């Protein structure tokens, strides 16, 4: 039997899962990750804690499965994207805590660049919007604020990387300073047209070229683990950012195929093929590159508040005792009776990108109940997903035929039925909803030569299919009501 080890380093936890090449889960281990909030709007992780926790997960997962490390055909790495790490090249010691993708400390810098009229140039080269979300401004901040860091970086003594790069460096015993093309595309320093680090962007953010990792395809081979670190020299065979890995794990290999990951927030990603789609309000990014094949691009939508809207009903309003109760409460009424909830509790993402939007509850009458509000919260997740997908369809010129879903909230049958009704296409929930981890393992399988995409596509198994049951006229009427409420929320804090 061939074994594949998936390393899934996320925002709140580190995980290692051992799979058979068939996709069967043999063992999984996870550890929570401490969040550090040194100032309002700042979010940091201790890079050394990430490494030590991940290493412990790897050892425990292999031991739990009862196999020797040398039996692992390949390791796949997937990770929280954009999170920025700097470390000393010679010792591998972190030189600052990792600045997490959620961190907003560089908002002034990105606003200043927008005011200089540079967003169109950045968008054209990277597919991204000028926002603190991405790595470039975080790295620029570190170089300017950490004593002596810029000087040392210019001397070649400092490495920069996203979390995948940091883990590969440590796993290889300092031999591999690499990243994959999907993670590189999220730094705002990588040109997704030329597929190279962009010299003009490096000058704009004042980044020394020598601190950047070498970029490789997503299953191109990334060296081996050190035997001292992992107990054997195991090939590091596949790497992708978390959302790209989830798209791969869902078997979305053809242009127009899409997945939505429903968690605290939600991410919607559509495969746009070898063509780079560009559209208002959606991000253009690299999905992956397989050996001997052209780069595959993707369109991405970010929804800031999804499951967190349900959490707010529980913690903020006390309408439910636990998030698990929301489905039954929402199902106790046949519709939301005209109630809409725009959960812009921290602004709105795709396609509005308005940090000044604030939450709106509208359409209340004397007959409105907490059940109507619970249903409106589920509808809000589905409406936001609909808005993102419509923007993607416009950008790609491809009409969505079905939506594959994963993440914690994908267990909510009512949410998925509402989603199918509002989209007007089937929503498919797979048996395995750990698509991110599975996608990394599949990439490792390709890199190690034990899998191909046809074998992976054949492994995808359906748990349940949700067919749309709503008439088109009603769907469009409800969406018009949603858009009316969104307009109320936009710019609320600024205006």
From Swiss-Prot:
Class of enzymatic activity (EC top level): transferase
Binding site for ATP: 11-13, 264, 307, 311, 408
Residues that coordinate or bind glycerol: 81-82, 133, 242-243
Binding site for sn-glycerol 3-phosphate: 11, 81-82, 133, 242
Gene3D superfamilies membership: 3.30.420.40
Gene Ontology terms, MF aspect: ATP binding; glycerol kinase activity
GO cellular component, one term: cytosol
Protein family according to the UniProt entry: Belongs to the FGGY kinase family.
Name recorded for this polypeptide: Glycerol kinase
């Amino acid at each position: 039997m061939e074994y594949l080890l998936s390393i899934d380093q996320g925002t709140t936890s580190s995980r290692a899962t051992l799979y058979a090449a068939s996709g069967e889960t043999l063992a999984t281990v996870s550890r929570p990750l401490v969040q550090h909030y040194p100032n309002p709007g700042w979010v940091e992780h201790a890079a050394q804690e990430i490494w030590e926790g991940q290493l412990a997960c790897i050892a425990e997962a292999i031991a739990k499965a009862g196999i020797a490390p040398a039996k692992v055909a390949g390791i796949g790495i997937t990770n929280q994207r954009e999170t920025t790490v700097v470390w000393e090249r010679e010792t591998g010691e972190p030189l600052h805590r990792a600045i997490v993708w959620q961190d907003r400390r560089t908002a002034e810098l990105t606003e200043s660049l927008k005011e200089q009229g540079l967003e169109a140039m950045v968008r054209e080269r990277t597919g991204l919007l000028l926002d603190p979300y991405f790595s470039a401004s975080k790295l620029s901040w570190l170089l300017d604020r950490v004593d002596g860091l810029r000087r040392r970086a210019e001397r070649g003594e400092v490495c920069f990387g996203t979390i995948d790069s940091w883990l590969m460096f440590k796993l290889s015993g300092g031999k591999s300073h690499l990243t994959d093309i999907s993670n590189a595309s999220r730094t705002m320093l990588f040109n997704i047209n030329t597929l190279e680090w962009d010299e003009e962007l490096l000058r704009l953010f004042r980044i020394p070229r020598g601190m950047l990792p070498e970029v490789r395809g997503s299953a191109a081979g990334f060296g081996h683990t050190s035997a001292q670190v992992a107990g054997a020299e195991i090939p590091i065979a596949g790497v992708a950012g978390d959302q790209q890995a989830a798209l791969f794990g869902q078997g979305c290999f053809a242009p127009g195929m899409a997945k939505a990951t429903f968690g605290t927030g939600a991410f919607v990603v559509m495969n746009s093929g070898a063509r780079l789609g560009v559209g208002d309000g959606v991000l253009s990014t690299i999905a992956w590159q397989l050996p001997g094949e052209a780069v595959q691009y993707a369109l991405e939508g970010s929804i800031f508040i999804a499951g967190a809207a349900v959490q707010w009903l529980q913690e903020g309003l006390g309408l439910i005792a636990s998030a698990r109760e929301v489905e039954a409460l929402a199902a106790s009424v046949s519709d939301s009776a005209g109630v809409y909830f725009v959960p812009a509790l921290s602004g709105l993402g795709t396609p509005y990108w308005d940090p000044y939007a604030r939450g709106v509850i509208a359409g209340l009458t004397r007959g409105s109940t907490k059940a109507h509000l619970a249903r409106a919260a589920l509808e809000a997740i589905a409406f936001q997903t609909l808005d993102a997908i419509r923007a993607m369809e416009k950008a790609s010129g491809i009409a969505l035929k079905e939506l594959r879903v994963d993440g914690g909230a994908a267990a909510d049958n009512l949410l998925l039925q509402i989603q199918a009704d509002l989209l007007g296409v089937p929503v498919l929930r797979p048996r395995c909803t750990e698509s991110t981890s599975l996608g990394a393992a599949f990439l490792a399988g390709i890199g190690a030569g034990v899998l191909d995409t046809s074998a992976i596509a054949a492994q995808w198994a359906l748990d349940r299919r949700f067919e749309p049951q709503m008439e088109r006229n009603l769907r469009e009427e409800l969406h018009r009501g949603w858009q009316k409420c969104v307009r109320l929320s936009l710019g609320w804090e600024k205006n």
